UniProtKB/Swiss-Prot annotation:
Alphabetically ordered keywords of this record: Amino-acid biosynthesis, Histidine biosynthesis, Hydrolase, Methionine biosynthesis, Multifunctional enzyme, NADP, One-carbon metabolism, Oxidoreductase, Purine biosynthesis
E.C. no: 1.5.1.5, 3.5.4.9
Cited Gene3D superfamilies: Leucine Dehydrogenase, chain A, domain 1, NAD(P)-binding Rossmann-like Domain
Gene (UniProt): folD
Reaction catalysed by this enzyme: (6R)-5,10-methylene-5,6,7,8-tetrahydrofolate + NADP(+) = (6R)-5,10-methenyltetrahydrofolate + NADPH; (6R)-5,10-methenyltetrahydrofolate + H2O = (6R)-10-formyltetrahydrofolate + H(+)
Function according to Swiss-Prot or TrEMBL: Catalyzes the oxidation of 5,10-methylenetetrahydrofolate to 5,10-methenyltetrahydrofolate and then the hydrolysis of 5,10-methenyltetrahydrofolate to 10-formyltetrahydrofolate.
Domain of life assignment: Bacteria
Biological process terms in GO annotation: L-histidine biosynthetic process; methionine biosynthetic process; purine nucleotide biosynthetic process; tetrahydrofolate interconversion
The family this protein is said to belong to: Belongs to the tetrahydrofolate dehydrogenase/cyclohydrolase family.
Organism listed in the record: Hydrogenobaculum sp. (strain Y04AAS1)
Record pathway: One-carbon metabolism; tetrahydrofolate interconversion
One GO term describing the cellular component: cytosol
Protein name: Bifunctional protein FolD
SUPFAM superfamilies from the UniProt entry: Aminoacid dehydrogenase-like, N-terminal domain (SSF53223), NAD(P)-binding Rossmann-fold domains (SSF51735)
InterPro entries with a match to the protein in the record: Aminoacid_DH-like_N_sf, NAD(P)-bd_dom_sf, THF_DH/CycHdrlase, THF_DH/CycHdrlase_cat_dom, THF_DH/CycHdrlase_CS, THF_DH/CycHdrlase_NAD-bd_dom
Length: 278
């Protein structure tokens, strides 16, 4: 069993970005928009703002009360679209129920959509125009982690557990672009084990603690755990790490696997947005 160490790769990516930023005429700028006071979201956005500082980016955190009117938020995003010095705009998800996530995403200028969720960027991902797309951060982080350990996707059976908008759906399309044979399991999948057991690469993104047990995984599989939950005050993933690490050829830890890569790829996307704008 080998550990897919997202923490060390993210550190390397951040170091390379920091060196590059030193030679730029102006600092790339990311604006993070947070609606409400959800503690987990607050931790995530503070991590993103800190990561910007670590590599020499400029950043701005715009916070709104949870009962902010949808139009007020949309108009704020439109004003950020117009600001020449803003390269990336990220609206932290989830949003309160009275605000349409789709409307918010659609309002972000696609050239500043560093989360990669705008239909234009999703369309480029779907069509295979990866060079010009902003690929959503977690799927991109997973791909870079696989690359770092020379894990080829071509012809591999990839099973993704979780069909969410943020990870599962875009990840399935990204894997297809690299010639993997992809199956996606969700809450209506009748026999998940039938799919997980044949996977060369198994990726779980459900947020259900210890959902993936050792009997669901084939010997020598690569196992990537995107899930993050708290159980008895401890951060855990979707995967029963102790038992599955005995069977897997490679496995990500939680924490220290996919999480740091998601932040590192946000920085990569922001730098890409900056370069496309100059």
């Amino acid at each position: 069993m080998n550990i897919l160490d997202g923490k060390s790769l993210a550190k390397k990516i951040k170091h390379n970005i920091k060196q590059e930023v030193k030679h730029l005429e102006r600092k790339p700028k990311l604006v993070v928009v947070l609606v409400g006071d959800d503690q987990a979201s607050l931790v995530y956005v503070k991590n993103k703002v800190q990561a910007c500082a670590d590599v020499g980016f400029s950043s701005q955190l715009d916070m709104f009360e949870k009962d902010v009117e949808e139009d007020v938020l949309l108009n704020h995003i439109k004003s950020l679209n117009e600001q020449e010095d803003v390269d990336g705009i990220l609206v932290q998800l989830p949003l309160p129920s009275h605000i349409s996530m789709q409307k918010v995403i659609d309002t972000i200028d696609p050239s500043k959509d560093v989360d990669g969720f705008h239909p234009q960027n999703m369309g480029k991902l779907f069509s295979g125009d990866l060079e010009n797309a902003f690929i959503p951060c977690t799927p991109l982080g997973i791909k870079l982690l696989l690359d770092e350990y020379n894990i080829d996707l071509k012809g591999k059976n990839v099973c993704i557990v979780g069909a969410g908008f943020i990870v599962g759906k875009p990840l399935s399309m990204l894997m297809l672009n690299y010639d993997a044979t992809v199956s996606v399991c969700h809450k209506y999948t009748k026999d998940i084990v039938e799919y997980t057991k044949t996977a060369d690469i198994l990726i779980s993104a459900t947020g259900v603690p210890f959902l993936i047990k050792d009997y669901m995984v084939k010997e020598g599989a690569v196992v990537i755990d995107v899930g993050i939950s708290k159980v008895n005050g401890k951060i855990v993933g979707d995967v029963d790490f102790e038992s599955i690490s005995q069977k897997a050829s490679f496995i990500t830890p939680v924490p220290g696997g996919v999480g740091p890569m998601t932040v590192a790829t946000l920085l990569l996307n922001t730098l890409k947005a900056y370069k496309q704008r100059i």
